[in-house]
Amino acid sequence: MHLSAVLNALLVSVLAAVLWKHVRLREHAASLEEELAVGRRAADPAPALRIDYPKALQILTEGGTHMVCTGRTHTDRLCRFKWLCYSSEAEEFIFFHGNASVMLPSLGSRRFQPALLDLSTVEDHNTQYFNFVELPAAALRFMPKPVFVPDVALIANRFNPDNLMHVFHDDLLPLFYTLRQFPGLAREARLFFMEGWGEGAHFDLYKLLSPKQPLLRAQLKALGRLLCFSHAFVGLSKVTTWYQYGFVQPQGPKANILVSGNEIRQFAHFLMEKLNVSQAGGPLGEEYILVFSRTQNRLILNEAELLLALAQEFQMKTVTVSLEDHAFADVVRLVSNASMLVSMHGAQLVTALFLPRGAAVVELFPYAVNPDHYTPYKTLATLPGMDLQYIAWQNTMPENTVTHPERPWDQGGIAHLDRAEQARILQSREVPRHLCCRNPEWLFRIYQDTKVDIPSLIQTIRRVVKGHPGPRKQKWTVSLYPGKVREARCQASVQGASEARLSVSWQIPWNLKYLKVREVKYEVWLQEQGENTYVPYMLALQNHTFTENIKPFTTYLVWIRCIFNKTLLGPFADVLVCST
């Protein structure tokens, strides 16, 4: 009897534990489903999206998946899906073929060479590819019951969510503009991150982009074994990226940068509004120089001395900020009102995109690290329309560096290398150009601590910042280009058998009358028909008579374009055909 009671008690306790765990799992799944179904209630006054399950299932089983993509290659492709599905068990996407399926582009096996598209903005990286497996819609009868996601989904990969430079450059900026590439997407979309990382150190920043909570790949398993998206966009626009990290060739600016400071500043303004950060009046009530303080590695060993020297040189308050000790909104508040930002090379410098126009960015490099080889922040600061002053300073004195050869390899340690290689690295005066990401000499040098040589730093800054640093009270204007010249005409006259004159005239581009332009000139190309060469002319007036080398009874092709301020070249007008 006693034994029976013990067994009963044990059975009851085990059953209770199992039931408790089951209830907790159900509650977790239910909370995620509720988040998917009614996530817009808190942040969006519009009614929650609902799925008519029988109708959705019928559309999927009969019609199948629908895909239309833009872009010619996998590196610039974005795809729009209806009824794309995801197996949380296989961790693969599924394209179900039904009687209404569309797959554009229809690539066949080329879809695997190497992929349909890049899920992240890091171009052609073999860990970032997107593809799907194909099944007939009839296979749904033998598969787990689909769970339909009612939200419009934007599906992408974050590249490195623990590094602030990667977060901004690879993820936030591209997400921001991809969401605005399609009508309504910024208000409706839920972000699905499929790379497999946890939330990371900066997940709160991703939450600012959409009124709905982003979901990670690991969370999808709790929703169901087979998820189907009624409407999904897959991939990210790369148009806002300006830097490549050196996976194929040594790192540097992208060959064809398509973003300007205007787009960067529009994004920064959006983020500042979301963070409730104001640029109207500095938080300290006066102009100041902001110095980024690092607390773990790449330290400025004489930071206090540096602060004092900057204050004395520029007659301005100097303050420090760090990512470790300040909330990110406070970092942005300080940066967005600073006259000068000083920092060792590092991810925190991406916050320069919040600096006011006219401010200075001073990037410090450790010994043996050539500033010309590592330029993500220089490239950002010097984008047209950013209107920042950029200064790079490098420690050239080996006695002013403190190395850490005993640290783990990923923190710059070299103790794991053979002695000859250690000796070579210690004697090297410059890190050679290299590929990402585990070059031991690069890691050894970039994780050094530095005693800044104050006189050389001040001298370097003064080469660029001549007077008082900080925003200038001047009107910063976007560079606007001329349109085509209008009403081009030509008139010819022949004088004898060997001489001729060709008079050409035109009207100004119509947008010129609405612009304030310092200098307007016209470039005219004159080409004899049938010849491969042309003669260029730069003219200040809207008419000109050409006499040199003009032949009688000859046809000439004339191209004309307007140029503003010597550098803003407008388009050529339609070719003018003139006969003498």
Curated annotation (Swiss-Prot):
InterPro entries: FN3_dom, FN3_sf, Glyco_transf_61_cat, Glycosyltransferase_61, Ig-like_fold
One of the Pfam families matching this protein, by short name: Glyco_transf_61
Record-level Gene Ontology MF annotations: acetylglucosaminyltransferase activity; protein O-acetylglucosaminyltransferase activity
Pathways per UniProt: Protein modification; protein glycosylation
Principal location class: endoplasmic reticulum
Keywords: Endoplasmic reticulum, Glycoprotein, Glycosyltransferase, Membrane, Signal-anchor, Transferase, Transmembrane, Transmembrane helix
Transferase in keyword set: yes
Catalytic activity: 3-O-(alpha-D-mannosyl)-L-threonyl-[protein] + UDP-N-acetyl-alpha-D-glucosamine = 3-O-(N-acetyl-beta-D-glucosaminyl-(1->4)-alpha-D-mannosyl)-L-threonyl-[protein] + UDP + H(+)
UniProt domain Fibronectin type-III: residue ranges: 488-580
Record's keyword annotation contains Cell division: no
Transmembrane portions of the chain: 5-25
One annotated GO biological process: protein O-linked mannosylation
EC number in record: 2.4.1.312
Subcellular location: Endoplasmic reticulum membrane
Domain of life, per lineage: Eukaryota
Enzyme class: transferase
Family as reported in the entry's similarity comment: Belongs to the glycosyltransferase 61 family.
Function (record text): O-linked mannose beta-1,4-N-acetylglucosaminyltransferase that transfers UDP-N-acetyl-D-glucosamine to the 4-position of the mannose to generate N-acetyl-D-glucosamine-beta-1,4-O-D-mannosylprotein. Involved in the biosynthesis of the phosphorylated O-mannosyl trisaccharide (N-acetylgalactosamine-beta-3-N-acetylglucosamine-beta-4-(phosphate-6-)mannose), a carbohydrate structure present in alpha-dystroglycan (DAG1), which is required for binding laminin G-like domain-containing extracellular proteins with high affinity.
Protein name stated in the entry: Protein O-linked-mannose beta-1,4-N-acetylglucosaminyltransferase 2
